[in-house]
């Protein structure tokens, strides 16, 4: 095996009250990560969405950081060339950096037959997130590896729970810049007990709803975060207006990750109406897609 081509999905983290815990894999958008054996060293090339803004230096690129660590840990003597085709816009709130991290970990596992578990792949993938977010995070890389719906419940040790789900989602991607750093800095350092109770209760209810295939309950609770979303809503011009306009057309709506992407669980009969509202307010790309699988191999040479 000389080359492997992997599809790595976009993801939506938080989903309302599940801040830094919940994650969802999306069938669209996605990145393609190609890894080819070379004589020595690690080289990186990028094309696609905002490719010119993505560093190709190994120590500054999220995929490069993951690759370097895995090559060191497993004493891989071969060099590699990483080619990333970005289908997920960086800074979108749809796990762009996570797709690169998960895609390279998955690809190296296949190319060099490392036989790592999905949990081990999440652990390596999360190291690359430190480049983008300042610290390792798994709420996006976990669904990118596992697919479906994931809960990252612990980091020491790393624990990820996985629930296969069948959901359709409608995602808007406003052309608004939201810095992940700013979106984290504006969050409160402490919260009242009543807010903690609200979010824990709603998050638990969402898991219950998934097991009972209750879209109404899942979406209603997804929309009821009282800690993070109120702080971030003002970073996305028009969000409060849109949330009010579509409230009867969706089961649930919230900010995807740190934004600016907005994720909804739409009522099928209103999909076109919601799309029109998104385009009227933001004139932006819209994805009508399903919850999808984690990384998978597209091609091997």
UniProtKB/Swiss-Prot annotation:
GO terms for cellular component: cytoplasm. It is an enzyme of class 2 (transferase). It is found in: Cytoplasm. The gene is thrB. PROSITE patterns: GHMP_KINASES_ATP. This is Homoserine kinase. It catalyses: L-homoserine + ATP = O-phospho-L-homoserine + ADP + H(+). GO terms for molecular function: ATP binding; homoserine kinase activity. GO terms for biological process: threonine biosynthetic process. InterPro entries: GHMP_kinase_C_dom, GHMP_kinase_C_sf, GHMP_kinase_N_dom, GHMP_knse_ATP-bd_CS, Homoserine_kinase, Ribosomal_Su5_D2-typ_SF, Ribsml_uS5_D2-typ_fold_subgr. Transmembrane segments: none annotated. Catalyzes the ATP-dependent phosphorylation of L-homoserine to L-homoserine phosphate. The keyword Cell membrane does not apply. The keyword ATP-binding applies. Its EC number is 2.7.1.39. Belongs to the GHMP kinase family. Homoserine kinase subfamily. Keywords: Amino-acid biosynthesis, ATP-binding, Cytoplasm, Kinase, Nucleotide-binding, Threonine biosynthesis, Transferase. Pathway: Amino-acid biosynthesis; L-threonine biosynthesis; L-threonine from L-aspartate: step 4/5. ATP binds at residues 89-99. Pfam families: GHMP_kinases_C, GHMP_kinases_N. HAMAP family: Homoser_kinase.
